[in-house]
């Protein structure tokens, strides 16, 4: 009986609720929210709510109450929160039927991306579809048919209202459009295609809040330099490309601007003999690179947005350049803004770190082991100055010692005492001392010893240079020349008188002419002029 009373009470409709909803024409504010904004975000949940409303057989006031209650419960419990609707694996390529665009589509599919190819006429995309069908994907690219990853989208970039729907939920946009070479006589081509159409795509990507925008322009767009500046003869194409770059820079979305060299003559086999080199902005004004090399570079940029984030890259290919991966080349180019990852990548990184850490018990158990390390790290460690010499690190290693100069008197004292017998004089007393069986002779008074080596050897005499003789024609009979080995030549004047001796010591005047020394030598006589005989 109590259970039945409870059942009857629970199924009854409160009078207050009926009175509050007497105005049937005024809809509930919560129902209006679920009808519009909630339906746009979560159509499945709103459909279930409407089915519950239709299946109810109660009065109109009770229906509104039940619908309001069911909507609240489904929103709180069954609807996940919306974080980011962009597909990180989807890329929109503008100009997909061009030389660079078609190769970019194939390279993106090889890396596992899904591609929305934007073309003005879908009938002209048959060659692109056939080339994609010929691709063979490996396991790293996701496998399956390559054409399943391609979606052709008709879109005229000169009409801004068509671009938003063509982008879809692509997270990356690659713009590879440009004025056609076939329409070289079209004066408005660079302005319409290279600037206005590109600006429309940039504006649509800004509204869609894409994660990455890659734009292909050309060398010499910002700074004048030959031979790149010659392209401005074709209706100022570099000027319009620069205005497109400025529109992308002002949009605020993450960007990468690729400025390739000449791509008209190089074929796809160009990469076999020429390697790609990357330079910073306004560095190169000439060079060539193939369309395939530029397409491969942009596909790698889309795969690694952190390496190409907010960078302006100039690309050419050279035979002398080393073969370097594009990822390593991109790291050498400085970024103009710090890299900010997308919310999806941040959420994935957080979940990956949480899954790798394990249960909370292990974390608590590891805390005590971490604490002592922090304490030891906080203590200041006194740094000891290490000597610069390597000899302090090894005990047995000694620096090479240069021989110290010794006084010449020490060695000469021993040699002289051994070789030349010194006369024994009573004036110089000597004392003999024996120390440990060795007799040493020390003289009380040491005289000055000669530094000349000739004193050590009695037979060794210094060379004597001949002294010049007095320029006299002949000497007197009583004068004899005595040549001593130890000194200069001397004249012996034993029998000469004193006046002659004084006369010999006086210097005599020497004639300046050499002819006085030789009797037979006469100076040459110049011929004297003779008179003519009549």
Swiss-Prot record:
The keyword Chloroplast applies. Dissociates from the Tic complex after addition of NADPH, while addition of NADP(+) reduces the interaction with PETH/FNR. NADP(+) binds at residues 91-120. Gene3D superfamilies: NAD(P)-binding Rossmann-like Domain. Sequence repeats lie at residues 387-408, 450-471, 511-532. Residues 50-83, 334-534 are annotated as: Disordered. Residues 387-532 are annotated as: 3 X 22 AA approximate repeats. Residues 460-469 have a biased composition (Pro residues). InterPro entries: NAD(P)-bd_dom, NAD(P)-bd_dom_sf, TIC62. Part of the Tic complex. Interacts with TIC40, TIC110 and TIC55. Interacts (via C-terminus) with PETH/FNR. Keywords: Chloroplast, Membrane, Plastid, Plastid inner membrane, Protein transport, Repeat, Transit peptide, Transport. GO terms for cellular component: chloroplast inner membrane; chloroplast stroma. It comes from the Eukaryota. Residues 421-432 have a biased composition (Low complexity). It holds the Pfam family NAD_binding_10. Residues 1-64 form a transit peptide. Residues 495-509 have a biased composition (Basic and acidic residues). It is found in: Plastid, Chloroplast inner membrane; Plastid, Chloroplast stroma. This is Protein TIC 62, chloroplastic. It comes from Pisum sativum. The C-terminus (346-534) is specific for the interaction with PETH/FNR. The central region (247-346) is sufficient for binding to the Tic complex. It is a peripheral membrane protein. One of its GO terms (biological process) is protein transport. Residues 63-76, 350-360 have a biased composition (Polar residues).
């Amino acid at each position: 009986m109590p259970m039945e009373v409870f059942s009857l009470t629970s199924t009854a409709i409160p009078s207050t609720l009926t009175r509050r909803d007497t105005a049937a024409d005024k809809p509930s504010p919560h129902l209006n929210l679920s009808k519009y904004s909630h339906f746009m975000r979560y159509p499945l949940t709103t459909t279930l709510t409407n089915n519950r409303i239709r299946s109810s057989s109660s009065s109109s006031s009770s229906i509104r109450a039940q619908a309001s209650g069911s909507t609240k419960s489904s929103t709180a419990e069954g609807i996940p929160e919306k974080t980011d609707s962009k597909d990180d694996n989807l890329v929109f390529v503008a100009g997909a039927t061009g030389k660079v665009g078609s190769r970019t589509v194939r390279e993106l599919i090889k890396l596992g991306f899904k591609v929305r190819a934007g073309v003005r006429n879908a009938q002209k995309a048959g060659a692109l579809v056939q080339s994609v069908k010929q691709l063979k994907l490996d396991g790293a690219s996701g496998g399956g048919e390559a054409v399943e990853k391609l979606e052709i989208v008709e879109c005229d970039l000169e009409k801004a209202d068509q671009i938003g729907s063509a982008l879809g939920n692509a997270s990356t946009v690659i713009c590879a459009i440009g004025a056609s070479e076939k329409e070289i006589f079209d004066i408005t081509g660079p302005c319409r295609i290279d600037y206005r159409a590109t600006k429309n795509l940039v504006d649509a990507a800004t509204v869609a809040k894409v994660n990455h925008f890659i734009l292909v322009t050309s060398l010499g767009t910002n700074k004048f330099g030959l031979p790149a500046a010659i392209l401005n003869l074709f209706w100022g194409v570099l000027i319009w490309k620069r205005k497109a770059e400025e529109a992308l820079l002002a949009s605020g979305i993450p960007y990468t601007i690729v400025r390739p060299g000449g791509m008209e003559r190089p074929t796809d086999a160009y990469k076999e003999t020429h390697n790609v080199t990357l330079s910073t902005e306004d560095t190169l004004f000439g060079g060539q690179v193939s369309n395939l090399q530029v397409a491969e570079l942009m596909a790698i940029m889309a795969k690694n947005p952190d390496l190409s984030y907010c960078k302006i890259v100039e690309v050419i290919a050279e035979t002398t350049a080393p073969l370097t991966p594009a990822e390593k080349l991109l790291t050498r180019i400085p970024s103009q803004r710090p890299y900010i990852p997308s919310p999806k990548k941040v959420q994935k990184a957080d979940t990956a770190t949480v899954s790798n850490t394990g249960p909370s018990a292990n974390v608590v158990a590891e805390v005590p082991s971490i604490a002592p390390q922090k304490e030891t790290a906080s203590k200041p460690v006194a740094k000891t100055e290490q000597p610069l010499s390597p000899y302090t690190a090894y005990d047995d290693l000694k620096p090479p010692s240069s021989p110290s100069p010794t006084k010449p008197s020490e060695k000469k004292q021993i040699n002289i005492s051994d070789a030349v017998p010194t006369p024994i004089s009573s004036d110089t007393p000597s004392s003999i001392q024996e120390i440990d069986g060795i007799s040493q002779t020390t003289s009380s008074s040491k005289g000055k010893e000669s530094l000349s080596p000739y004193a050590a050897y009695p037979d060794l005499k210094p060379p004597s240079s001949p002294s010049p003789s007095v320029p006299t024609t002949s000497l007197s009979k009583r004068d004899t020349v005595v040549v001593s080995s130890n000194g200069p030549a001397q004249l012996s004047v034993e029998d000469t008188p004193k006046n002659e001796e004084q006369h010999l010591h006086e210097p005599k005047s020497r004639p300046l002419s050499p002819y006085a020394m030789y009797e037979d030598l006469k100076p040459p006589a110049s011929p004297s002029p003779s008179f003519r005989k009549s």
